[in-house]
Amino acid sequence: MDSNKDERAYAQWVIIILHNVGSSPFKIANLGLSWGKLYADGNKDKEVYPSDYNGKTVGPDEKIQINSCGRENASSGTEGSFDIVDPNDGNKTIRHFYWECPWGSKRNTWTPSGSNTKWMVEWSGQNLDSGALGTITVDVLRKGN
């Protein structure tokens, strides 16, 4: 990495680990960014795109990791959202997730919304104070069969 790069935007980041802890698959849908970029695991300089995630199925005991940060040399952080949907129930939304990790702000946002009573979804790890939003783990489980 070029030592002359402005790393401040890279300091605004989030890693979201979606873990299927149940026996039914779910899919990622509608992933989009308002600010920042998505990047490959462990490499903020290797940009990836929403199309790399949208439509991906996460099977039983599988994990998928979504990484996002601000763009280098830009005074912006990262902001985006995505849905997880049930492919066995007409792609009905399980939950909607929104994040914002703004550059130069004292507050971060992590907002899961929506409800699907067939699924249990729990999350932990979000840092709502200034700096990086951090690593958020989301456990997803379809109840029953």
Swiss-Prot record:
Under the heading Pfam families, the entry gives:
Aegerolysin (PF06355)
Q: Name the residues of the propeptide.
A: 1-8
Q: Does the keyword Membrane apply?
A: no
Q: Its domain of life? A: Eukaryota
GO terms under biological process: symbiont-mediated hemolysis of host erythrocyte
Looking at the keywords, is Electron transport present? no
Annotated keywords: Cytolysis, Hemolysis
- What protein family does this chain belong to? Belongs to the aegerolysin family.
Name of protein: Aegerolysin Aa-Pri1
